[in-house]
Amino acid sequence: MTKEKFYEEERKLIEKAKGGDRKAMEDLMDRYEPLFRKLCAGETRMDWEDIRQDLAVSFLEGVRAFTPERGTYFPYYIRQRLYWEKVHLVERMMRRRSVEVQ
């Protein structure tokens, strides 16, 4: 599949997902499953599940908020969004744990 065809297919999925098509949203999430795994790698099982769930919510919100008119490719946009979401999640988890220890 050419890069242009991939992006065109993805753009159509995003439009459908924004319109409420659950199958399109599931297809998008499946496409980005390797990214979810990469971001959760190295975490304990309990943390992994929490982070994975929060990243999925952020992904859904990100699809709805994405505006291709801004000229950003969706893969770049969603990678950045999920990366920073994970950073903030881990910071909150660490703060919560430090409060529990004290």
Feature-to-residue mapping (PLM):
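Internal acidic/polar
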Residues: 96-102
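Alpha-helical promoter-recognition and RNA polymerase-docking modules of transcription initiation factors
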Residues: 1-95
